[in-house]
């Protein structure tokens, strides 16, 4: 089981973490999960100019119907990835993140749909902290990451998809191929909770400087 010691205090000024809508069918579930965790959150269209974003503590790049493995485009997500805040990419957001930083995302040889088993790799990193080594997640993808970028490591894998999760060495960029926001993902709430904790620690670090 992965271990990540963290804290965040929602009695203080709430964290501001927005969800970038890439056209995913479950984007509102990501927003609701953040609301449940007492985060100040909005759903933002992925065409929104960078200068129109609020002052954010973190961003989630949602999944979507876009075939990132084939087109390599996802609204203004490239500009958002330049921000110095923690970012979590889900499904298409994960694939785009990998491509943006020099990895490879393309069509899956074995697309996955429905409940699947994944195994944590390399300790699972921060997002999988407190979750089981083997767990059930909800998949819905035709494309996948085939190679993580330099400076990233694999955090989870399944028999048919070797990169179900990734994290950079700095610990502020995270990608998940599956959908933690769907109820069938066994530890989805814990994953969002862990991302919120990362955002809190990043804000605390900036405030102390």
Cite the ranges covered by each PLM segment.
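Pocket-forming structural segment of enzyme catalytic cores
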Residues: 50, 74-90, 95-190, 194-198
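Accessory terminal helices/loops
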Residues: 195-209
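Intrinsically disordered, low-complexity serine/threonine-rich segments
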Residues: 7, 65, 118-120
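N-terminal amphipathic/basic-hydrophobic helices that include classical n-h-c signal peptides
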Residues: 1-9
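Residue-level detector of intrinsically disordered, flexible termini
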Residues: 1-2, 155, 201
């Amino acid at each position: 089981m992965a271990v990540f010691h963290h804290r965040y205090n929602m009695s203080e000024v709430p964290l501001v973490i927005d969800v970038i809508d890439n056209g995913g069918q479950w984007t509102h579930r990501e927003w609701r999960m953040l609301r449940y965790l007492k985060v100040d959150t909005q759903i933002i269209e992925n065409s929104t100019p960078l200068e129109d974003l609020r002052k954010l503590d973190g961003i989630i790049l949602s999944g979507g119907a876009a075939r990132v493995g084939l087109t390599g485009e996802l609204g203004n997500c490239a500009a958002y990835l330049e921000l110095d805040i923690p970012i979590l990419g889900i499904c298409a957001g994960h694939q785009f993140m990998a491509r943006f930083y020099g990895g490879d995302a393309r069509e899956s040889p074995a697309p996955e749909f429905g409940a699947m088993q994944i195994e944590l790799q390399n300790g699972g990193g921060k997002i999988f902290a407190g979750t089981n080594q083997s767990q059930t997640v909800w998949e819905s993808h035709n494309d996948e990451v085939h190679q993580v970028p330099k400076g990233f490591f694999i955090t989870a894998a399944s028999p048919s998809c070797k990169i179900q999760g990734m994290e950079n060495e700095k610990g502020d960029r995270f990608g998940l191929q599956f959908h933690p926001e769907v109820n069938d993902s066994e530890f989805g709430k814990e994953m969002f909770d862990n991302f919120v904790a990362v955002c809190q620690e990043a804000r605390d670090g900036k405030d102390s400087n």
